[in-house]
């Protein structure tokens, strides 16, 4: 592969897309693969109170700064590194003191619930995968993750799931399944399946 290519891994919250992206990162190695979480591009909300931030709909397309991400992807495709923002999920805003350096390696993976929603992002993808996982399993994974890793209460996770997460999944995320080059189940996969997917990605981007 002579220059950077962008691929996407999309799917519902807690579908396994982040795990898949990092499995591909591990297989390809850091010299060839880097991962950009779409979550890093949540719009900064430092100008409103924490209470107001907690009430925002984080599963709607407007929650993400897709323009900034597209600009960064264009820079990578031009051979330039970028400083991706880092998002603080406990405070619902960007960490203004830190960034994540992303270099124009062979394959840059954009992973997130709406990675396939934005036309301006789809325009630069060389390959795309949608991770399809049962809703009940996704909820159980989300509950465990948000309580243990993001400082959330079980009640708040339940409330957010019913109010925005699941409705927005049905409206904006699930329809993008049809836009993916490939659909994988998120219940489980083995090393062989990851290796075969990596081969297909390499073939598509060469």
Model-derived features with residue positions:
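P-loop (Walker A) phosphate-binding loop of NTP-binding proteins
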Residues: 12
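Conserved lysine of the Walker
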Residues: 17
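Hydrophobic positions on the alpha1 helix immediately C-terminal to the Walker A/P-loop
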Residues: 20
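Post-Walker A helix-loop "phosphate-sensing" segment adjacent to the P-loop in P-loop NTPases
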Residues: 26-34
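Conserved nucleotide-sensing/catalytic segment adjacent to the nucleotide-binding pocket
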Residues: 34, 43, 47-90
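ATP-dependent NMP and nucleoside kinases share a basic, alpha-helical "lid"
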Residues: 95-149
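NTP-dependent small-molecule kinase module
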Residues: 103-104, 144-147, 166-206
């Amino acid at each position: 592969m002579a220059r950077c290519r962008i691929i996407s891994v999309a799917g519902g919250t807690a579908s396994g897309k982040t795990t898949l992206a990092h499995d591909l990162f591990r297989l390809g190695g850091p010299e060839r693969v880097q991962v950009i979480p779409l979550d890093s591009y949540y719009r900064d909300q430092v100008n409103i109170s924490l209470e107001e931030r907690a009430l925002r709909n984080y599963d709607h397309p407007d929650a993400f700064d897709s323009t900034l991400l597209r600009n960064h992807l264009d820079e990578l495709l031009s051979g330039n590194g970028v400083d991706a923002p880092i998002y603080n999920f406990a405070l619902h805003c960007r960490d203004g003191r830190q960034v994540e350096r992303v270099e124009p390696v062979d394959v840059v993976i954009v992973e997130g619930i709406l990675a396939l929603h934005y036309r301006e992002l789809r325009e630069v993808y060389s390959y795309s995968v949608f991770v399809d996982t049962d809703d009940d399993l996704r909820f159980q994974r989300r509950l465990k993750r948000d309580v243990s890793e993001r400082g959330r209460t079980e009640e708040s996770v339940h409330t957010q799931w019913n109010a925005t997460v699941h409705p927005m999944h049905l409206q904006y995320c699930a329809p993008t399944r049809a836009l993916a080059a490939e659909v994988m189940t998120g219940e489980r996969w083995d090393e062989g399946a990851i290796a075969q997917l990596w081969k297909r990605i390499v073939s598509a981007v060469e």
